[in-house]
Amino acid sequence: MEQYKAYLELHRSRYQDILYPLFFRESIYGLAYRHESFFIENVDYNNNFSLLIVKRLSTRMYQQTHFILFVNDSKKNTFVGYNYHFYSQIILEGFGIVVEILFSLQLFSSSFRGLEIVKSYTNLQSIHSIFPFFEDKLIYLNHKSDIRIPYPIHLEILVQILRYSIKDVSFFHLIRLFFYYYSNWNSLFPPKKWIFTFFSKRNRRIFLFLYNLYVWEYESIFLFLRNKSSQLQLKHFRVFFERIFFYEKIKHLVKVSTKNCSYTLFFFKDTFIHYVRYQGKSILVLKNTPFLINKWKYYFIYLWQCHFDIWAGLETIYINELSQYSFHFLGYFLSIPLNLSVVRSQMLQNSFLIQIVIKKLDTIVPIIPLMRSLAKTKFCNVMGHPISKPVWANLSDFDILDRFLRICRNFSHYYNGSAKKKSFYQIKYILRFSCIKTLARKHKSTVRIYLKKLSSEKLLEEFFTEEDLFSLIFPRTSLTLRRFYRGRIWYLDILFRNDFVNYL
């Protein structure tokens, strides 16, 4: 059991002094010279919260000779000798930069010449690997669990999680001081709000980091449990169903009957557990008995309640059978229906009819949410009829076409793997005629006249994907080729990150 407790330390061997690079300002400037944010991208920060300001603040702090004092009041807290609000904002911003550097070193071995991926993290996969996984593996699984990651979490729990990785007493006193200033220390985060909305947008970097730290902690424990459960078929374990650490290795040999031993091993063998997290939720897909799946459900609940002190009820996890349940995932509507196929087999004078159950993954484009998104962005009305985009009417023809083509190409790349293309073609139709109406509005012409002009100049060919061009070039292809081109094509660009999943 001691070796498992050591494993649950989660490789917390980087005992860094977090305040050292912050106070020795030249070091933090050198560390962040070529550093890009690892946890957040494209955040509009105020120019007042730059690395240069952090350096100047550190210099000013060295020049101060008086102590830092608090004056407790029922309405406000005043900071004697300092502009506390300004200083705390600056130091929190500097702290966010420092911890991103230190924790990104756990994923990347950083140097001033470049970055090299650590061997233990070379199996990081892109979002594009999810769809082939669904097509190849999901049909062999039978249960799916929707897990809503519980929050709010107490700030003290976050600080304690951080202490496992970074041991610096002075830092934790300082960070508690900042947290106490921004909130009542004995209160939780407000419900139904994201973790960084409790604080100002200026501190989004630091609290995104703390939220990711919380998720990383619980997922690391879950990964440990999942890996050990998959190895139970190779070693003898004693099972404890009522505890989070639900098994320990038997140090002394125990005489058990072969029947009981084989039953225990069969109970955990061939688990087929797959876990995906996105947008504050996660999906756990399994192939197991309902009894073991319910046990995993209670393991999650006990983990959150006992390890993180978060109340998680039974409603945070829903378990459904994949064959009887459809679900939304990453902008798709997924279902696995059971298709019955009848095969006639004849042997000499006797013939047999054999029914074969075949599972097939259906990936359907969610037309209603997409229509709402297009109507919200003024590409169509609430009925789905294309309308012009008057905001873009002042742009050049090239810019208008480029914007519409980029949006249409993104839709084509992302939804080309849908099983039923009717909804997919409706979206392309809306975008195409919205572009034509916008150009006709700009040139004060009718849609019919401008459509002929665009067709003659072949400016709309970019609206066709490779699959559509195949159908135009080979209109009389064989039945086999038609079935091939009508099939599912995952046209995904690993160099491009699609943003549609954030709005669906």
Curated annotation (Swiss-Prot):
The keyword Plastid applies. It comes from the Eukaryota. One of its GO terms (biological process) is mRNA processing. One of its GO terms (molecular function) is RNA binding. Pfam families: Intron_maturas2, MatK_N. Keywords: Chloroplast, mRNA processing, Plastid, RNA-binding, tRNA processing. This is Maturase K. The lineage of its organism: Eukaryota, Viridiplantae, Streptophyta, Embryophyta, Tracheophyta. It is found in: Plastid, Chloroplast. The keyword RNA-binding applies. Usually encoded in the trnK tRNA gene intron. Probably assists in splicing its own and other chloroplast group II introns. Belongs to the intron maturase 2 family. MatK subfamily. InterPro entries: Domain_X, Maturase_MatK, Maturase_MatK_N.
